[in-house]
Amino acid sequence: MTKKRAERLTGYEIRELPPERGMFTVGAFEGDQLIVKAVGHADFLALRALVHGVYFVHSRKAMEQNGWRCARCRASRHLEIHHRKYRSHGGTHRIENLEPVCRDCHKLIHREERSQ
């Protein structure tokens, strides 16, 4: 996994520490305070698994809330999760930011956004 991808997945800034190869610092802002913690590779993998786990649980909950149907056309096949506000723009994996859509509607959403 690349550093950039890990930062995107976790929402944390990740820097490799020079003295100990394989160690990472993980930092996040809480209010106006920066919390930084050094973690090893195993902890980093656990953090990544936690982020994926949260996404999985919230995705399923969003699907359930919508009756396992596309929020746009109400189809029930080929469902995907659309982030209303992208992670790259500060969006989260919170349920209110997730929208279940079918593959066709998902493509259409992104096509419309690119054309604006």
What positions do the PLM features span?
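Short, charged surface segments at domain edges that flank catalytic/cofactor-binding sites
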Residues: T2-K3, K37-R69, H89-T92, E96, ...
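Histidine-centered catalytic micro-motifs used for acid/base chemistry in nuclease
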Residues: A71, E80-Y86
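Short Cys/His-centered divalent metal-binding micro-motifs
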Residues: H78, L98-Q116
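Short, cysteine/histidine-rich loop/knuckle motifs that typically chelate Zn2+
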Residues: A71-R72, D104
